[in-house]
Amino acid sequence: MKLKYIILTIGLIVLAHLIILFVCFYQPADSKTLNVPEKLESPKTAVKNDSSATVRPVQQVNPSTGVAAVQPVSESRNRQYPPFNFQTAWKGVIPDLPASAGTRAGILVDADTGNVLWDKQASTPVQIASMTKLMTLLLACEDIQTGRNGVTLQSPVKVSSAAMKIGGSQVWLDPKETFPLEELLKAVAIKSANDAAYQVAEFLGQGDVYGFVGRMNRRAREIGMKNTHFHNPHGLPGKTSAEDNISSPADMALLAEYCLNHDKLMQWAAMPKADFRGGKTELVNHNNLLPRRKYPAPGVDGLKTGFINRSGYCVTVTCIRGGKRLIAVVTGFDSGKNRDLFTRSLLNWGYARRNDPAAANLKTAQIKPRPVSRQVRKTAARKPAAKKTAARKKRK
């Protein structure tokens, strides 16, 4: 009898071990394979847990300005935007903004869709002043990207006497100096330095500035800029309006899209300030819509301002809010302040219209610039300017 109890006890122990092994190693059929959700989620929970859902950046308020600074979404800068085509773009009903009286020509583009949210004579050629430098910067970045003639960001560039003589906005280059190419490009993008732009063109053109300008015009045609012609790499005025660089707001919006595809260019354009010459010279960005500038607008991360007497105050602006990218181009204002305040209002209105067209009632665009005091003369026949070595001292 005692032996039976011993055998029974051993049997129970073995059975218990078998049960434990079964529980530990048995795996039920995968619920995903059976198309059965592991856990039912409410719609709100499902969206929250969906890794593909758009996550909007957290807005942080700048204590000094009281303006919410929207941090750019990293993926949006690296993405390739569809080439903008003004002729085929969806335009819907283009409103006549009551605040746009001060702009000679302009456009607001949704870079993600290519839709035109607003335009005013957007295909009309106008003087573009220093917005010219966007093409100079684009060609430089493309040369670096492809390694054209062995060019890199660290390529040493010796300053020429011709570059030193270029006037207007400048960093006072000296023929005794040599800079890495990147330093000169920063001076072009941030300070809008005309002498640096000339020096970059001379370097990339292997001594032939006008050969580089020819490349600028060829590249403009290649990417579809139909109303654009360059005479120089910096945007300073010619002796007559026929020698001024011209483009249209639609063309400049297209050029801005190509610039968006170059991280370094956008990094420079987004800097409110930067050091030059190892900190001996400060570069201050002319774009007052950037953070820590006079009229900061949430999400603005570029791109380029411009001014000569015949162009008025103009700007090409890139902005991203909630992962959505807009490009604004305005020209012809009689003051930088009016240009900046209108552009900021235009961006606010554009995002409201983009998100809810019915809600965009133009109330955000209340700035009414004074009428333009200087009317830009119509550009004469586009004849290439003769080669000149003398400096053009006119004000930028």
Language model segments and positions:
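Conserved catalytic neighborhood of penicillin-recognizing serine enzymes
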Residues: 164-198, 282-301
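N-terminal Sec-pathway targeting helices
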Residues: 1-12
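Short, glycine/proline-biased beta-turn/loop segments that scaffold the active-site neighborhood
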Residues: 146-173, 217, 274-278
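Long, low-complexity, intrinsically disordered segments
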Residues: 383-396
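Hydrophobic alpha-helical membrane-insertion segments, chiefly the h-region
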Residues: 13-24
